[in-house]
Amino acid sequence: MRVFVTGASGWIGSAVVPELIRAGHDVVGLARSDGAAEAIAARGAEVLRGDLNDLDVLRTGAADSDGVIHLAFVVPSVSEAATRADAEAIDTFAAALADSGKPLVVSGGTLSTPGRVTTERDELVAAGPIAARITNMKAALASADRGVRSILVMLPRSVHGAGERHGFIPQLIAVARAKGVSGYIGDGSTRWPAVDVKDAATLYRLALEKAPAGAVLNAVGDEGVAVRDIAEAIGRHLNVPARSLPAEEFEGMLVRLLSTDMPASSAITQHLLGWTPTHPGLIEDIDEGHYFS
């Protein structure tokens, strides 16, 4: 297949592109800068210059492909401008692929269902701080009604691996270095789902190749890792204590993420696609030490 990938030079794209190429697919990666173009080309993919605001470029990339994997997001925060650009990009892809039966694989985030482990069958409810993004996810799934094989890949809070520089684990390490304490909020019992980036890349490929229209897939290796265990693993490597800190010691999304229990299962996904995570879990990955070099 000829696959158009947005976010091809990003953290997840850097694993997805080689995974697709190894499986025999031809990849066209969207690049908004010279650096991104060089990174995409170095991985063996063709480059299409543009960004998520270039709808004509997105339309061309999708129309000339056998499927789209949408990994890009304009900025790392959930801003109105970013979610609007995401919505327009998804609509552009859906229109370009309409009535073709071709796959449109869109990224989301695993849900939080108080008191239990979330699954792929939980309803997408557009509420809370990421309501606009959930609306976009629902729009992507609805493109199945337009003859598109639309699929959601729901990513956990930690997509980890060697080379990660900007995710939540590097942020927690930076806080621990700055404060001399590896911290968590409360008793640290809240849990994060996690997946190795290479396992996530395999799931994106399987989704592209054989997931049915309307599928919601959880890219989860670790169902739930206690944030206290994460803090202790970081503390071991930095030789600092791990203990509870007031919420105000953390910034941005970390406060909500450290305070919210959000375990997630991928049992349905694994059964549907035959996907089995095989790479190290989050604590084992932290203990390998590459985050601290």
Task: Give the location of each predicted region.
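N-terminal Rossmann NAD(P)H-binding glycine-rich loop of SDR-like oxidoreductase domains
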Residues: 3-25
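NAD(P)H-binding glycine-rich loop region in Rossmannoid oxidoreductase-like domains
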Residues: 29-91, 95
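Conserved beta-loop-beta element that borders a ligand/cofactor-binding pocket
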Residues: 138-162
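Glycine/proline-rich active-site loop of Rossmann-fold NAD(P)-dependent oxidoreductases
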Residues: 134, 160-170, 178-179, 206-217, ...
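Amphipathic terminal alpha-helices
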Residues: 280-293
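A conserved pocket-lining segment of Rossmann-fold NAD(P)-dependent short-chain dehydrogenase/reductase
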Residues: 174-195
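Mid/C-terminal beta-alpha module of Rossmann-like enzyme folds, strongest
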Residues: 2, 182, 203-254
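Conserved Rossmann-fold NAD(P)-dependent oxidoreductase catalytic core, especially the SDR/UDP-sugar
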Residues: 81, 88-130, 151
